[in-house]
Amino acid sequence: MPHQESITQLKQAIKVWEHEFQRSNNRIPSRSDIKVDPKVYELYKTYKVLKAKTNNVRNIQDKRTLESANIGIDINMSESQSDAEDVEEFNNENSDSSNNKLKNQDTELGPTPQANGKVLSILDIRLTPPDSSPLKNKVGSRSTDTYSNQKDEAPEDTFKTPTKTRVNRINLSELTPTNNRGPRNKSLMQKLEQASSAKNTRIEMHTPERNKVSLLQNMETPQYLAKVNNKFNFDMDDDSNDKDNVVAEDLHTNSSMKIISSIRSNIIDPITPTKSPAPLKFQVSPSPLKPHRLFSFGNNRKLSDIFNDYKNIKEDPDLINSIENEEEAAELDDDDDTIEKDTATNGPKRKRITQKRTTRRWKIKPNTEETKEDKLKNANIHDEVKKLDDEARKNLVDYMEVNNMHEEDETTSEEEYVHQDPNHKDMKGKVKPVRMNYQRLKINDPRIKKFKKRMQNRR
């Protein structure tokens, strides 16, 4: 193919120029750059024309193959132009409008043209829509009679889209069954005719009701729930049995009203059957008053021994008193339990909320001197001071004498050691130095000055 060789040569020359331009300018050439150089512009133009011709020839060949494959599809192509004429017209149009196309290259292309889901080629100018089914050769159009009349009247050159005919819509409520029941297996046309006739005549429709007689005739009650069955009705009297027999006789009658009234009047709630307990098999008699049941709680005592003990209890008065005391204590305990139960029902006792203690609780001794009368009210102070001094001197002398006595006892080994009584009359009111070792933290002594100040600050 000479066209294919020339196209490849033109393509190579264009690519060489594009690469050189990109190296020199560091960008891809645009349309304005192509139009600046006339030689390059001619190369692009000739390449485009040759490429279009080759594409047209390929499309014609593809179309011929499709026509040979789709012989069954009835497409009216008699009025369309032949392939050769279309190619010639297309070439003429391309040669005439080449300059116009170069000017309008900047415009955007529209969507791809399609018809009946198939992409249209350049030659599919007057493609008529095919019929919906390619397997059946239909006579006339695929629309209604109104469209066929319009097609006969319209000229053959023009093609018009078929219009939809108006169809009377049918409400689903019109297809509901009526009281006049017919055969169930109706066709669709019969149902539609019935709905249209019901719409015209406006017959009142009602909800269908069940046939109670047929239901009662086909009704079968299980044996354990039957009205005549007295297997599980343990508490029924003779009157109820008579009523059940009457119901059984009425069920055999032909009148439906009698059957319904008797069933409604004598309905008995079904009782769930329960399994009866198995009989207890005792090897001995189950009497609770047997001696081995009464007195065999951990000891195998005889009845005679228990009787003798009872006699001894009656004769001994101490045992009787102790038993009575135990009974009274048990009664008191029972009373306490009842009181506790009563209080428990009233609700749990809550501890009273008081002020929280933030400091240490000290032991405060009462001040007894304030309660007594003032002894020095009518006394001479100087005399009292002298008495105190004399007592202090006397105590000191006694203390010194006691120490001297201890020293003499240590020196004389022959004499026996006599233990001094701490509660001796001579030692009363004197300081005991041994006890001073054990006196610690005496902060609450009312005779101390700090304690008195602390009490005054609290007031």
UniProtKB/Swiss-Prot annotation:
Which residue stretches does the UniProt record annotate as biased composition, category Polar residues?
A: 140-149, 160-182
Compartment(s): Cytoplasm; Nucleus
Out of the domains of life, which is the source? Eukaryota
Where does this protein chiefly localize? Answer: cytoplasm
Which residue ranges does the record annotate as region Disordered?
A: 79-208, 327-358, 407-459
> Bias category Basic residues: which stretches?
348-358, 449-459
Gene Ontology molecular function: DNA replication origin binding; single-stranded DNA binding
Gene3D superfamilies in the record, alphabetically? 1.10.10.1460
A Gene Ontology biological process in which this protein takes part is: DNA replication initiation
UniProt lists compositionally biased (Basic and acidic residues) regions at 150-159, 416-429
Q: Where is the composition biased (Acidic residues)?
A: 82-91, 327-339
Q: Where are the transmembrane segments?
A: none
Task: Show the GO cellular component annotation of the record.
Answer: cytoplasm; DNA replication preinitiation complex
Q: Which UniProt keywords apply?
A: Cell cycle, Cytoplasm, DNA replication, Nucleus
**Family listed:** Belongs to the SLD2 family.
Its annotated function is as follows: Has a role in the initiation of DNA replication. Required at S-phase checkpoint.
Its protein name is DNA replication regulator SLD2
What is the source species?
Debaryomyces hansenii (strain ATCC 36239 / CBS 767 / BCRC 21394 / JCM 1990 / NBRC 0083 / IGC 2968) (Yeast)
Q: What is the lineage of its organism?
A: Eukaryota, Fungi, Dikarya, Ascomycota, Saccharomycotina
